[in-house]
Swiss-Prot record:
This is Cytochrome c oxidase copper chaperone. The gene is cox17. The keyword Chaperone applies. It is found in: Mitochondrion intermembrane space. Disulfide bonds join C31-C62, C41-C52.
Length: 70
């Protein structure tokens, strides 16, 4: 029986990829956490751009880390 010891890559959760990443994710997949929170807020609010401004900015900031200008 061989004991397989895998590197602890599972400990890195929700950590953005380095800016100079060789494999840049597609815009739709770059920031799923901030995108989901922003979209949920926009759908549930009557005045999305105002009520969700902080979530929108958080998503823009996340996207900028990957080199996307939103």
């Amino acid at each position: 029986m061989s004991s397989s010891t895998e590197p602890s890559t599972a400990t890195k959760v929700s950590e953005p990829a380095p800016i100079a990443s060789e494999e840049k994710p597609k815009p739709c997949c770059a920031c799923p956490e901030t995108k989901q929170a922003r979209d949920a807020c926009m759908l549930q609010s009557s005045n999305g751009p105002i009520e969700c401004a902080k979530l929108i900015e958080a998503h823009k900031k996340c996207m900028a880390q990957y080199g996307y200008e939103v």
